[in-house]
Amino acid sequence: MVMKYDGHAAVCNSAMLALLSDKVKSDPGCNTETGWLYQSAFYNGVNEATAYIPTMDIIRGLSGGAEYLASVGIGLVHTVEGVGFANDLDIDMIKILAPGLPQAFRIFFQTMDLKAVKKHGFKRVGGCFKLALDGCFGSEDAALKEPYANDPNNYGVLNYPQERVNEFAIGANREGWQITMHAIGDAAVEQCITAYEAAYADK
């Protein structure tokens, strides 16, 4: 699996496609002829692909990345975790390893499952993946109020109804947590701002 530069699509060879579930391959965002994965097919495909990464590779990747960042003077990392590893393995790994790494880490859990955030004791929630309100311009699925200039039938994709985003923002705000959401297109930005307004208005 090779990720697109924008982090919102990927292409798989036939061997990787064979490992993916029917849920991914039957998704409208999956093109089994070309191997391209977009939107929910991409997110679910990445979630399934992470199951094939050995735990020691995760540990080496985290520690090696932290050492490199330290070598170029970076001492604080805002890390977004929760990309589909079984039992949130990446979340547990960063929690265990962070005290021994050369940076301070501020962890954002990429989930709308507020119970899971509370269970891990985090005060920050959000990022991309489960918090992606839309896609991106590179894949032409950033959510817009007006159609794409090169495709008058394409307004992009909103991944959630407004009510669901409001519910998430209100719940997280009640806990006093810091919230981040991925919103690229103007329709998604408006959805995000509307959810923040709902959270602030909540009594």
Where do the model's predicted regions map?
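A short helix-to-beta-strand connector/capping loop
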Residues: L101-Q103, F122, G127, K203
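Short intrinsically disordered, low-complexity coil segments enriched in acidic
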Residues: M1-K4, L131, K203
